[in-house]
Structure formats: C-alpha cells, structure tokens
C-alpha cells in the first residue's frame, strides 16, 4: 500500500496476516530485499494477529520478521480493536518535519 499524507510525502506499507503468534510472517525474498533497501524511509510492515491486534514494524526489521517467530519480534506499536485509525495513520504517514 502506498500512502500520501497531506504534506505530499509518501509511505510504503506491506500488509500481512499471521494465523498463529508462533508462526513466521510470510515475506518473500523480493519483499525483504525491497523493504531492507528502503528501511531508512517511511516504510513499514503491518501485521494483523488472529486476535485482530494490528502490529506495526519498521521496514528495517523485515529480516527478523521473516526468519524469527512473530511472537519474538518487537513491534513499534500495537493497536487493539476498536482501532484508532487516526493514530495508525499518523504513525504510518508522519507529517513533514518543520
């Protein structure tokens, strides 16, 4: 997903779902390569758990997400249901620095 905030800045979000907390996030080598290459940018991996929590990870963490169990990886933020969509958008598409 490509987001554009009100300042015209773009963010990239890779959306994933895990079936169990003990499983690994299903990321292809191509996805890992792209996210690793752009880990310094406003790029994220967003993972939904079976309990519907939304976990946000920095793109720089993509290799750990692919190789380690999901439950062993530390997200930037976890959002529970009901979701605060404004806060999620603020995290995923931050405004330009003043």
Spans of model-derived segments:
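Mg2+/Mn2+-dependent nuclease catalytic core
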Residues: 18-38
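Acidic, Ser/Thr-rich peripheral helices and adjacent loops at domain boundaries
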Residues: 62-73
């Amino acid at each position: 997903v490509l987001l554009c905030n009100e300042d015209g800045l773009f963010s990239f979000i890779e959306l994933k779902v895990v079936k169990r907390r003990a499983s690994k996030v299903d990321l292809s080598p191509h996805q890992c390569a792209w996210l690793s290459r752009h880990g310094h940018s406003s790029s994220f991996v967003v993972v939904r758990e079976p309990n519907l929590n939304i976990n946000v990870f920095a793109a720089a963490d993509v290799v750990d997400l692919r190789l380690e169990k999901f439950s062993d990886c530390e997200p930037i933020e976890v959002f529970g249901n009901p979701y605060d969509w404004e806060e999620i958008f603020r995290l995923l598409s931050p405004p330009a620095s003043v």
